[in-house]
Amino acid sequence: MSTGTPFLSTADIAHILQWRGLGPCLRGLMEALRADFMRWEDFDKSARVAHHSPVGVIELMPISDGRTYAFKYVNGHPGNTALGLSTVMAFGGLASVTTGEPQLISELTLCTALRTAATSVLAASVLARPDSRCMALIGNGAQSEF
């Protein structure tokens, strides 16, 4: 019997970052990403499902490795700043493929920013020249303006 689906909030993630430290967290994310990229073929990758409207977009991004099923819901609404809201917000879920039982619900706005940073470092470690000392990033995600 389930004891309830855990929810990971922005405050929970901030607490983990303070407790563990940003560097160790990013290194852990980078290694998890590296491990997942090494098993790329194991994932059933589906195209994102998008709903476009005059005021923004809402996207659903599903993926599964046959053991777990995950999704990310993310929006992009440029006019939200006039309402005192973020222009980009995200959350997601993780479930068992075997039982369908939800295993985790999480905010993913902050998580996506952390994932982007870890992916950038991972890509640079693989693609940069060995003598490189700096890197420039041009982004078009939550940190950018519409």
Please tell me what each predicted stretch does.
Residues 1-113, 119-121, 128-131:
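N-terminal ligand-binding/catalytic initiation module
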Residues 120, 131-146:
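Glycine-rich adenosine-cofactor-binding loop
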